[in-house]
Amino acid sequence: MPERKTQPTTDQPWTKPNDGGDESGPRSPEVERPNTRDLLERMKRVDPRQARRYRQRSGE
């Protein structure tokens, strides 16, 4: 079995490819998380039993 080759390591930390301030690529939109109370109220209107199961799973 051939020996493994080792590559030289660098002292620089790993960074994301877009960390350099590059504005050319797509980026995820900055949106706030939906309020879980509103979600539960909407679920209650559609299917009360499903809302109860979701509430038990999510710990609310």
Swiss-Prot record:
Keywords: Isopeptide bond, Ubl conjugation pathway. There is a cross-link at residue 60 (Isoglutamyl lysine isopeptide (Glu-Lys) (interchain with K-? in acceptor proteins)). Residues 29-50 have a biased composition (Basic and acidic residues). One of its GO terms (molecular function) is protein tag activity. InterPro entries: UBact. Residues 51-60 have a biased composition (Basic residues). It holds the Pfam family UBact. The keyword Metal-binding does not apply. HAMAP family: UBact. Belongs to the ubiquitin-like protein UBact family. This is Prokaryotic ubiquitin-like protein UBact. It comes from Fraserbacteria sp. (strain RBG_16_55_9). The gene is ubact.
